[in-house]
Amino acid sequence: MNVRQLDISRRTIALAAALIGTVSLAIGAHAALNMRALDAAKAVATDQITGSVGQTSRLALVIGNGHYPDANAPLTQSINDARALSSSLRKKGFDVDMVEDASKDDMIRAVNRLKSRINRDTTVMLFFGGYGVQAGRESYMLPVDAVIWKESDVRRQGVSIEGVLDMMKQQGAKAKLVVVDASRRNPYERRFRSYSHGLAPIGTPDNALILSSASPGKVVDDGKGEHSTLVAELLNNLNAQGASAESAFNKTRIAISRASEGDQVPTVSSSLLEDIHFNEAGG
């Protein structure tokens, strides 16, 4: 091989090496772009999951119990109320977990689901429609599978309203809203009491608002409408433009008290530190 041929061979090898290097760089850059795109997609997916499951700022647990085997007739209004209230709250930005005709296990699971999602930015609402009984100066929501013959059965078979409120507080909820429509004559108390005692006063933890369908110790009738007296009036007030929770609850109390001429006086207890608006645009 002469000198000229050797020089050409060297230039050819150098050119090939440069070409291989360029191709390698292109492949590497393409792979890096793909990895960045994959990482971005993962981040978006994580944000979506976190936003819908872990970081929702408004949560509601709505329980409507209507079909109690021990009752003479179903509480159809409780089911209607739970459905209508769930629909209204969803329109107002709440992520609603609705449970109908819940057993004790169903109610405990629902409370635990709620517990797992509460954080310090969360406004939490609990609604219960059904039968409620007080025992030991504490109010209990009764599941449809409750078997009650004595007062101790209430504590064992029921779900404590104060217990759910305590859970909300321990989880650090920003605000706690509770609506209890359970001051009805029930088929259980006559087995161990001479008359129905209604519900006990519900303790109000910090930054909480509680609406109950009757005064402590009182029972009320449901009326004959599609919804209970309490929920029918509450739905009207929730839909008012710019309604705050405290305003809606108080207007509900006043309207029912006046319409019934004092026969039914709902109770509102508040320790709220700021206004909570049902319409998100209102605050």
Feature-to-residue mapping (PLM):
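Cysteine endopeptidase catalytic domains of the caspase/legumain-like
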Residues: N2-G283
